[in-house]
């Protein structure tokens, strides 16, 4: 079973990009420059009066720097390598109708050539203030969960992803978490390698795996009924994303270490009846302001940030480590 799931891990890492929101990771391939076609010079007019040069359409080939897709590339990786968001790269390449379908050999515009601004004015232009630098990073953390003690043949593989924007001080500007959870029942008959029916795998090879992330599942994920907060998975994750804005990754790590229990959950100050004796001993050391903060936090979210289900803190650290400036 472990060998089979090892294969699943390899497949799933390729498809885990479905969990990625609007930012991207770092690629190591290089780009090539394609020059725009030079317009032909207009014919000399017969008349002695000056004549306007004819208009030449060069819109079919956009001037700028192009990247040539190689096997294994993803659109978000190409965007990240060149300091772009997925949306920005898509706007540069309107000919690409589906960013999830790119092919080896395809050329993608990654930097448009800036037209020289002609000016006859002798006045001095105002100098615009320097733009604040932003950095983007993407992180993944995969973990295999042995669930045998709870349910036979129901182990699972979880791939946690995070896309983040950081300012030049390292503070989080935007943050999006998600998880792809891969269960055995997504592979009918996978426990029997000799099974005659291999149609699932054949279809997958032709059409891909139609997996949904936890956010894509939305309310169908079904956490709301059992959550002490009465909130669905995506609602709680949205809360964490907003709460961590303005903090550095180091500050998030410190917050997690101090205010979360052994299961990676914030101490449930909003639900004191849920606190264990160990929890009560710990929160007794907090100030009133800290206790109030935890009431506010656990009103919005109580699910774990780091446990066998998912590794949000690990993924966030990786995103920061590979951050690249957005240009």
UniProtKB/Swiss-Prot annotation:
CC cofactor: cob(I)alamin
Keyword Nucleotide-binding listed: no
Signal peptide (UniProt feature, chain positions): 1-24
LysM domain location: 65-110
Function per UniProt: Reductive dechlorination of ortho-chlorophenols. Dechlorinates in the ortho position with respect to the hydroxyl group.
UniProt-annotated location(s): Secreted; Secreted, Cell wall; Cell membrane
Lineage: superkingdom: Bacteria
Protein name: Chlorophenol reductase
SUPFAM superfamilies, A to Z: LysM domain (SSF54106)
Domain remark in the UniProt entry: LysM domains are thought to be involved in peptidoglycan binding.
GO-annotated molecular function: cobalamin binding; ortho-trichlorophenol reductive dehalogenase activity
Keywords: Aromatic hydrocarbons catabolism, Cell membrane, Cell wall, Cobalamin, Cobalt, Membrane, Secreted, Signal
Induction statement: By 2,4,6-trichlorophenol.
Main location as per UniProt: secreted
CDD domains according to UniProt: LysM
Reported regulation of activity: Inhibited by sulfide and to a lesser extent by nitrite.
GO annotation, biological process: anaerobic phenol-containing compound catabolic process
Gene Ontology annotations for the cellular component aspect, listed alphabetically: extracellular region; Gram-positive-bacterium-type cell wall; plasma membrane
